[in-house]
């Protein structure tokens, strides 16, 4: 009987971590670490929901997009509000932002909550979401947006105890 040997593992593709773009041999790498899905949310429009349990402090995934100046991001946000009402911008510094409008990354649908279960971290130009606490299967993934272009003019609909009332 012949000896069975495991097949050699294919080499792992190199990942370029510059700016907000991941590349694996010229193709976009999947930035999701946990399974999530986008579906209607009771908070606002579409939301993103956990399809598996996520432990506290674990990286959930990333969003990618076009790097733009913060001034350009505010300009695009105002234009988007007038047309679609949906804005997918993340400030990565006081001068730079990521426009995630045209990405397929599901975490761009993370809604705001005054009692979020995720935190957004920007490291080396990459926008990542990490669990603040254990997250159950089916739970909506939320983040505190912080200061926004709404400047307190948009009603918050998170429904969390102690909700601030506006964004």
Show which residues each predicted segment covers.
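Catalytic cores of histone-lysine modification enzymes
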Residues: 8-11, 16, 23-118
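C-terminal SET catalytic tail plus cysteine-rich post-SET Zn-binding segment of SAM-dependent SET-domain
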Residues: 2-11, 114-167
């Amino acid at each position: 009987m012949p000896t069975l040997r495991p097949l050699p593992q294919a080499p792992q593709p190199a990942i370029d971590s510059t700016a907000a773009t991941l590349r694996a041999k010229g193709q976009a790498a999947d930035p999701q670490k946990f399974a999530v899905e986008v579906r209607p949310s009771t908070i606002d429009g579409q939301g993103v929901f956990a399809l598996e349990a996520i432990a506290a402090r674990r990286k959930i995934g990333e969003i990618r997009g076009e790097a733009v100046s913060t001034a350009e991001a505010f300009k695009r946000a105002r234009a988007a509000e007038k047309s679609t009402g949906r804005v997918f911008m993340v400030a990565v510094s006081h001068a730079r932002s990521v426009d995630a409008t045209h990405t397929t990354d599901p975490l761009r649908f993370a809604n705001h909550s005054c009692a979020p279960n995720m935190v957004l971290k920007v490291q080396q130009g990459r926008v990542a979401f990490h669990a603040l606490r254990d997250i159950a299967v089916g739970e909506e993934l939320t983040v505190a947006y912080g200061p926004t272009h709404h400047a307190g003019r948009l009603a918050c609909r998170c429904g969390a105890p102690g909700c601030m009332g506006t964004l």
